[in-house]
Amino acid sequence: MYTMNTISIKGRFCVKSATIYKNPDVISRACILYFHGGGLLYGYRCDLPEAHLEQFTSAGFPLIAFDYPLAPACDVKDILQDVIDSVNTYLTEPDLFQITVPGSNPLPYVLFGRSSGAYLTLLSVASIGKHDFSMPDDLPTLKKAPAGVLSYYGYGFLEDLWYENPSHYYQTLPTMSEAILDSLPSEPHTEGPLDTHYSAYVYARQSGKWKSLFYHDREKYFLLYYSLRLCSELPCPVFCAHSTGDTDVPFAEFQKLTEKYHAIRFIASGSQHDFDRDTDSAQTKELLKETITFLHTLI
């Protein structure tokens, strides 16, 4: 059985928290650093199902779930900087997280994200990957590469159009007005509840204006710095999971991502984006089994 402890950590743009899950009866092999999904517009760090937390911690992988600031109050550059800061805090101040004996080195770590959280973890790792261009000096980088990356239905904006065109799936839902954006906090914040923030994501995908809510610079810089298109190699192995009929992120995006980085693949049937929310399904059980097998190959 795991324990749970929440701490405050320094944020670049606002106060933020991290929640640590650990099984005290199991020897820790490596630490999973987790970043939630939500299209950069909504979500909360403590969104992992109980089954995931129980299996990871029982297998010797304590997990730290981090906040990060949300759009449109912060843009993708700010968000990415904050995520990299969180990882570097784990590396430089391990005693904060009480995973290991005080004064000892941090455990090896694995980055884990779902949906937009996976996008952010992949971009973070790409900060020390091989590129076909020079990264700007004002973008931070990870101080040390992770042992691996877990990407559940993540993306790198490798396919054209899907993130800029209106989504056919979201257009089947009740139409949301642009006025919904006025209800979102204008100051940086890290929690985006479904009842207040999800409608903004629906509007963004219905209208095809999603990218404009988290990126405001020139188009060429978006593809250079905030996609994976020109990152030719990542410094660690990657495990990617996706459903064939994903309604948010097209399967073709998953195919390009896994081919580009020679990732271990888990393919689920069906159309649900976050298919692992159903923890009773055979697919989710197999996903967790294969994820832990992958983790064991790293450490």
How should these model regions be labeled?
Residues M1-I27:
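N-terminal cap/lid segment of alpha/beta-hydrolase-fold proteins
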Residues V15, P24-F56:
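Short, surface-exposed "cap/lid" segments of acyl-processing enzymes
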Residues C74-I99:
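Alpha/beta-hydrolase active-site loop
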Residues T92-T172, M176:
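Primarily recognizes the serine-hydrolase "nucleophile elbow" in alpha/beta-hydrolase
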Residues Y152-L230:
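Accessory cap/linker subdomain of secreted extracellular hydrolases
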Residues L234, C240-H242, D246:
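Short beta-strand/loop motif that positions the catalytic acidic residue
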Residues T247-E253:
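Conserved alpha/beta-hydrolase "acid-adjacent" motif
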Residues S271-T284:
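Catalytic histidine-centered segment of alpha/beta-hydrolase-like enzymes
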